[in-house]
């Protein structure tokens, strides 16, 4: 099996290094990732300048582009063989609920799925993970991903991926299949004056999770709930954002 690994934290991030080490027993692992952090780039492709892949080690490449660029290049001519699976991560920080709209980790996985290959996005969720600087900090999460793939990935329809969030806890309680939760409105932006007297702004922090009473009543838990309670969250998500119930209502009322 040929496995392509990408991320949005950059080719030197400890999460991608831990993931590559963990998956090597499953086949050939090729890492193609941005040369520096590209968080928040979603599925963006670089169209205004050339991309320059640079091989920095055996089966490890750095690209001056976005996470989706890395996958696009890898599956459209950078290599003379095909990949069987795309794994994006392990991201330093959660990609829960509405986070998937912005996530370069998820964007890279979706790009792989557009190329007709199974794809998963993996993130490590916890308050301290942004400070982790060694691949051993991601070892438990990487092993979980190895085991998940080794057992055989469940089949998904076309244009679907698994979005996986692994809590940063001493011992995982298990795995829950979850729905994509949602957050309250983001915190307000913060404003400061820089040393040269110019006004600058920081995007506000992400909002808190919002509960869904209807889904709670049906005993389906959100990705937020699973991670907060020590479970790995596995959420099937899709590219098609059409609301078919509303579509049918509009057809009935306006058609």
Curated annotation (Swiss-Prot):
Reaction(s) catalysed by this chain's protein: a ribonucleoside 5'-phosphate + H2O = a ribonucleoside + phosphate
Family per record: Belongs to the SurE nucleotidase family.
Enzyme Commission number(s) from the entry: 3.1.3.5
Keyword Transit peptide in record: no
Keywords: Cytoplasm, Hydrolase, Metal-binding, Nucleotide-binding
Name by which UniProt lists this protein: 5'-nucleotidase SurE
Binding site for a divalent metal cation: 8-9, 39, 91
InterPro entries xrefs: SurE, SurE-like_Pase/nucleotidase, SurE-like_sf
Cofactor binding description: Binds 1 divalent metal cation per subunit.
Keyword Calcium: no
Organism listed in the record: Acinetobacter baumannii (strain AYE)
Transmembrane residue ranges: none
GO cellular component, one term: cytoplasm
